[in-house]
From Swiss-Prot:
PANTHER family: CONSERVED EXPRESSED OXIDOREDUCTASE (EUROFUNG) (PTHR43708), OXIDOREDUCTASE YCEM-RELATED (PTHR43708:SF4). It comes from Salmonella typhimurium (strain LT2 / SGSC1412 / ATCC 700720). GO terms for molecular function: nucleotide binding; oxidoreductase activity. Belongs to the Gfo/Idh/MocA family. InterPro entries: Gfo/Idh/MocA-like_OxRdtase_N (IPR000683), Gfo/Idh/MocA_oxidoreduct (IPR051317), NAD(P)-bd_dom_sf (IPR036291), YceM-like_C (IPR048477). Keywords: Oxidoreductase. It holds the Pfam family YceM-like_C. This is Putative oxidoreductase YceM. Its EC number is 1.-.-.-. The keyword Oxidoreductase applies.
Length: 307
């Protein structure tokens, strides 16, 4: 099997913190280079990571089999379209595109070109969340909270819903097994239209699902709580596992070998995409799964602005 040639588009904060440490550890692939429209900044970053800088998106596409896209959401449609039309497989940060219509077009284009298009929902690959998912066969309720210390603004409601709350909705619905029906919800905004608090209630058969986010909670905390027939589960910040059963409380320590990026699912996400490209299999977050949560979140936003 030929070694997969990987490229990177976009070298912002998330790319530097979460993706470059994974992708520069070339286990089974080669990192051909990176491109960013901010040339001077990109050159400095590429030099520090010892990555070749490529002077255009077209040249990057011509030298790669697959590309990870970490550019701004506003650029996703144009960048991903160009890569797919050049015959390149793509893994892109969420959301797939700035609006649902463009996201659907990209899904259709990837299908037409018979290429892999995956959205990098890293939480689906967090080991503790994946383990929790196997324990939810008899779950009665599932609650996911993702709060911020003090992050009201500067962006508007729609931006924050798609940039951050989307993680909560996607992870909760994935843990619950897929689609769910919205029962009720609340969206509170500041006087200038910035998101302050969101809480929504969904149902999937007998399972009740709650998603919640406060933008000024005084704590940067993420947790998932599940009530099942015979056990209570609580996963905090993707690294603390607490399980309560009749015989007592089990708290699992973090494996000493597991890095933070592995705990948060970035390593698993990147490897899953690369494995799918190499083996010509369908990623877990491709097709409708790539845009399921975006459909829900955009509907929440439309409902909020129509009130």
């Amino acid at each position: 099997m030929r070694t997969l040639r990987i490229g990177i588009v976009g070298l912002g904060g998330i790319a530097q913190k979460a993706w470059l440490p994974v992708l520069t550890n070339t286990a089974g692939w080669t990192l051909q280079g990176a491109w960013s429209p901010s040339r001077d900044k990109a050159l400095r970053i590429c030099e520090s990571w010892r990555i070749p800088y490529v002077d255009s998106l077209a040249n990057l596409a011509s030298s790669c089999d697959a590309v990870f896209v970490h550019s701004s959401t506003a650029s996703h449609y144009a960048v991903v379209s160009e890569l797919l039309n050049a015959g390149v497989h793509v893994c892109v940060d969420k959301p797939l595109a700035e609006n649902l219509r463009d996201a659907e077009r990209l899904v259709a284009l990837a299908a037409q070109k018979k290429l892999t298009l995956m959205v990098g929902f890293n939480r689906r690959f967090a080991p503790l969340y994946r383990e929790l998912k196997t324990r939810l066969g008899t779950a009665a309720s599932l609650r996911m909270d993702k709060h911020r210390t003090d992050s009201v603004g500067p962006h508007d409601l729609r931006f924050t819903l798609l940039d951050d709350y989307l993680h909560v909705v996607d992870t909760a619905l994935w843990l619950a097994g897929g689609e769910a029906r919205l029962a009720s919800g609340t969206l509170l905004t500041s006087e200038s239209g910035e998101m302050c608090y969101a809480e929504h209630h969904f149902s999937a058969d007998k399972l009740q699902i709650t998603t919640s986010m406060h933008r000024r909670a005084g704590s940067q905390r993420e947790s998932v709580q599940a009530v099942t027939d015979g056990g209570l589960y609580d996963v905090t910040d993707m690294r603390e596992w607490r399980e309560e059963r009749g015989q007592g409380i089990l708290i699992k320590p973090i494996p000493s070998w597991q890095t933070t990026l592995e705990q948060r699912g970035f390593v698993g996400c990147a490897r899953h995409f690369i494995d799918c490209v190499q083996n010509q299999t369908v990623p877990e977050t491709a097709g409708e799964q790539a845009i399921l949560a975006q459909r829900v979140v955009e509907a929440l936003w439309r409902d909020a602005i129509s009130e």
